[in-house]
Amino acid sequence: MPRSTARAAWKRELAATLALGLPLVLTNLAQMAMTVTDVIFIGRLGSQALAASALGANLFTAIEFFGLGLVAATAPMVAHALGRRGNTVRDVRRTVRQGLWTAVIYSVPGCLLLWHGEAILLAIDQPPELAAQAGAYLRALMWAMPPFLGFLVLRSFVTALQRPRSAFLIALAAIVLNVFGNWVLVFGNLGAPALGLVGAGLASALATLGLFLGMVGVVCLDRRFRRYHLFGDVWQPDWQRLAEFWKLGLPIGAATAFEVTIFNAAAFLMGWLGEPELAAHAIAIQIASVTFMIPYGIAQAATVRVGHAYGARQPDQVARAGWCAFSLGIGSMAIAAALMLLAPGLLVSAFLDIGDPANAQVLRLATAYLAVAALFQIVDGAQVLGAGMLRGLHDTRVPMLYAALGYWGVGLPSGAALAFWAGWRGVGVWSGLAIGLALVAVLMMQRWLRRDRVGLLRRA
């Protein structure tokens, strides 16, 4: 390929990745904003309600995120079918329908576990009064799981068709619905009963139902999606495609669970160190979570772009799609890392009154954690981008093993050792997380570089 032609191809791919990735980043941030609005309303109920909601939310997240990973198989399977250009409409329809089946199938045991959330929290030695409040909250919040997983399936479908903006607009509307629902149900406005913490759970469930119904409306009414007839005979089982879906999705779910639960475990370690460490950790991890949404959205775009090229059997385009996404994601995280190093006080001030002398210790600790988080950002971005690129090649089982090794085999043990044995305390926990993420990032990128030699490109 002539140099000018190659340069033009790279520019086109960079523009296409950015056009696809930006709405996904914004949608992810909008979904985070729903959680933030819940915290704001619950915080007005008092510290005990806030603590109970945090307990419940941690359990909900641990269960929900496995399902999130499971239905994430939708995007690479649909993208591959579109790239292959065979019997595309039927193939895409089969995949999306089985994604919806998967959302329902997983939600049944997931909701059963959440229904017994109080018993689970008591079993892990949480305070009985907090466990009781968290259990009541979870019995309301659990109804958000089925529509949320269904929303993710339909969002993956429109994303694979490279039309992600509708999902972002619906997510914005859901934020408004969530705020209104909290105002009505938490405090008993407009004649509704004041349900407190339970009201916050119901508001989230109703807003999430709105997310799903909004996406149903889009795929049924928009002519670009309507021709796929996704809901015709949706109750008809397709066992072969369901098995293929779970074969690809189960490792994604497991890898996602490994990552989410290591952060839950890190919070427990911080709790053992003391209240100031835990408070500083909560602030630093919230900042890191917001910036993580950027490479996470770009990684979702990478899955689609790589998947299209993989289905079309275009190895050069596979490489362009992967490296363009990687460059965008790492570039964004480098900016985030610089901000954490140069202006930590500005970031912390969004969560803490840094002028209050009573907060001096938490400010000092949070600033130290953000210094480690600057490195953390780069490797966290690299690992999620690597996973997204490999997912586009339908490579999920080996990355799952990498996640298990990096997070639980190396990251958590090294964090505990540095925190308690080396005396690094909270900085040790964060350093352990960074070490684990760095290992996963190196392994993911090594596999991407060896994608042809290990036979990933020959499976299309």
UniProtKB/Swiss-Prot annotation:
Subcellular location(s) per record: Cell inner membrane
Any Pfam family hit: MatE
Location (main, coarse): membrane
Single Gene Ontology BP annotation: monoatomic ion transport
Gene field: norM
Protein name, per record: Probable multidrug resistance protein NorM
A single GO cellular-component term on record: plasma membrane
Organism superkingdom: Bacteria
Entry keywords, A to Z: Antiport, Cell inner membrane, Cell membrane, Ion transport, Membrane, Transmembrane, Transmembrane helix, Transport
Source organism of this protein record: Bordetella parapertussis (strain 12822 / ATCC BAA-587 / NCTC 13253)
PANTHER family xrefs: FMN_FAD EXPORTER YEEO-RELATED, MULTIDRUG RESISTANCE PROTEIN NORM-RELATED
